[in-house]
Amino acid sequence: MLTIPEGILLCFITSGSVLGVLGNGFILHVNCTDCVRQKFSTTGFIFTGLAISRICVICIIISDGYLKLFSPHMVASDAHIIGISYLWIITNHTSTCFATILNLFYFLKIANFSHYIFFCLKRKLNTIFIFLLGCLFISWSVAFPQTVKIFNDKMKHRNTSWKFHLHKSKFIINHILLNLGVIFFCMVAIITSFLLIISLWKHNRKMQLYVSRFKSLNTEVHLKVMKVLISFIILLILHVIGILIETLSFLRYENKLLLILGLNFSSMYPCCHSFILILANNQLKQASLKALKQFKCHKKDKDVRET
């Protein structure tokens, strides 16, 4: 049985995950519709890949969390451990990769630096995207053998009570190698986010010097982008913290509260960031407002028919 705090946190994560799937599903629907109507754009490809991978990440986090809470015997099975590990590697690495590509895309499109390296990167935008997708496949090729190694180590020590403190350094090294791709993508995303924030901040300072009475429209847009980037960094850090908490709960099966807390933190990023993207992107925002209007009209028609 769950305690009251555990039950509240579980309800919170369940409702948040449903909203996260709906938000990412909406992004996927809008971009797939645009793909059918007109030529598939680079941003459409990025948003589609990001939405699909995040829906999968949310489903894996929730399903694995519920199994650990209510059916721990199923989680202990070898087939479940291997299966969920491979699915997690594919979806989590893919989600982080597409989020990094999206950040890099906005950085190269919006930022303004006079350094020649920045201009070289800007000219070779498609090449950089292909390079990052190549890094995604490399991260899979590193993570898959590492998963098998971790699983085999656990199988060897199954009958001799595998203890964390006896293999602390090995445990940390294995998990660093397992998440090497995610660490690389996160570093690139955070660095590009900070550089874009610096560029926008410098631009806003210049605008304040030249435009003292009237607020520039570009300044408002830049402030909105800065808020989106800061929220992205915060959510990404919470996601990493959540995964670390879940890893700690793996070592202490009796602590359900720690597991649910980790699930809440790790699911915030793929769930909340989708709504931030919808509000920040004009195309997605207009589509969401149109969908809300249609829903309200449908509800009114239904109420009229019932009366």
UniProtKB/Swiss-Prot annotation:
Keyword Transmembrane: yes
Family stated for the protein in its record: Belongs to the G-protein coupled receptor T2R family.
Species this protein is from: Rattus norvegicus
Bilayer topology: Multi-pass membrane protein
Note, other: Several bitter taste receptors are expressed in a single taste receptor cell.
Cytoplasmic side: 29-41, 105-124, 201-227, 279-307
Glycosylation sites (chain numbering): N159
Keyword Transmembrane: yes
Annotated protein name in UniProt: Taste receptor type 2 member 106
InterPro entries documented for this protein: TAS2R (IPR007960)
Record topological domains on the Extracellular side: 1-7, 63-81, 146-179, 249-257
